[in-house]
């Protein structure tokens, strides 16, 4: 198969659809991979890394699209690019399929394009591996960014999230005990915060305790509990 990896166009987007290690695995299976020059730069991967993995570097988005049978992107092509897609081509990306306009879907259907949304890929047990990975990253970053926003420099209360001798740690309240919330809690605990999690699901809260242990305080998400938690929180994360 011919697989194309174009450079992402959106501002401040640093992700790339495939790392050099993934390219190497595909090449070893007999596939040919075309990577647009600079596609991995934002993620810390040089063109030379992709070449060492067996990819061929192309010097334009159009060439990456036209050479590929499977086009792998982070963000789906813009509607203006649909005419560049080849009949029968497969495009794997975050399509946000429920939000795609019907007329745009019709164009893709007319051109015989197979659109695979990364956001709807599921394992046999119903879990979503790509969304889970993104949520874990977002949760960890949320805890780190939140910790920095507690500093005076950023308009915060001047609190060190982990506290210090004689000074208590920050109180972090997380609303939601899903993948993102658990990831945020894990990082916040590592930073030394006192973490309280609220959710409407007792099984989810139980899973948090089983995964992270007793350092996390759990509360059923009711109005009285919300009012109580928000009253003592130094930092609140909606997850």
Language model features with spans:
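Conserved PLP-enzyme active-site core in the AAT-like
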Residues: 57-61, 226, 239
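Short, hinge-like loop/turn segments at secondary-structure boundaries
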Residues: 50-54, 132-136, 213-217, 237
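Residue-level detector of alpha-helix initiation sites
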Residues: 76, 137, 178-179
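Glycine/serine-rich phosphate-binding loop and adjoining beta1-alpha1 elements at the start
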Residues: 2, 8, 79-171
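Glycine-rich phosphate/diphosphate-binding loop of Rossmann-like nucleotide-binding domains
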Residues: 6-42, 155-238
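An N-terminal-biased, well-structured beta-alpha scaffold segment characteristic
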Residues: 2-107, 111
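Short gly/ser/thr-rich secondary-structure transition/capping motifs
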Residues: 52-58, 73-75, 152-158, 216-222
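Short beta->alpha connector loops at strand-helix junctions that form conserved
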Residues: 36-37, 60-61, 94-95, 117-122, ...
């Amino acid at each position: 198969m011919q697989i194309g990896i174009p450079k992402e166009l959106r501002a401040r987007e640093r992700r790339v659809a495939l790392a050099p290690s993934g390219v190497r695995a595909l090449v070893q299976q007999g596939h040919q991979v075309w990577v647009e020059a600079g596609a991995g730069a934002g993620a810390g991967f040089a063109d030379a890394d992709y070449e060492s993995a067996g990819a061929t570097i192309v010097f334009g988005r159009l060439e990456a699209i036209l050479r590929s049978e499977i086009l792998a992107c982070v963000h789906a092509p813009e509607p203006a690019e649909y005419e560049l897609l080849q009949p029968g081509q497969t495009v794997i990306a975050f399509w946000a399929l429920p939000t795609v306009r019907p007329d745009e879907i019709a164009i893709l259907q007319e051109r015989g394009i197979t659109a695979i949304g990364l956001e709807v890929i599921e394992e046999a047990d119903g879990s979503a591996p790509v969304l889970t990975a993104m949520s874990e990253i977002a949760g960890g970053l949320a805890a780190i960014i939140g910790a920095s926003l507690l500093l005076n420099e950023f308009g915060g209360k001047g609190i060190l999230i982990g506290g210090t001798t004689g000074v208590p740690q920050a109180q972090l309240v997380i609303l939601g005990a899903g993948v993102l919330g658990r990831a945020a809690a894990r990082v916040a605990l590592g930073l030394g915060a006192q973490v309280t999690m609220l959710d409407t699901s007792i099984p989810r809260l139980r899973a948090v305790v089983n995964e992270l242990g007793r350092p996390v305080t759990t509360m059923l998400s009711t109005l009285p509990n919300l009012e109580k938690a928000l009253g003592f929180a130094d930092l609140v994360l909606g997850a």
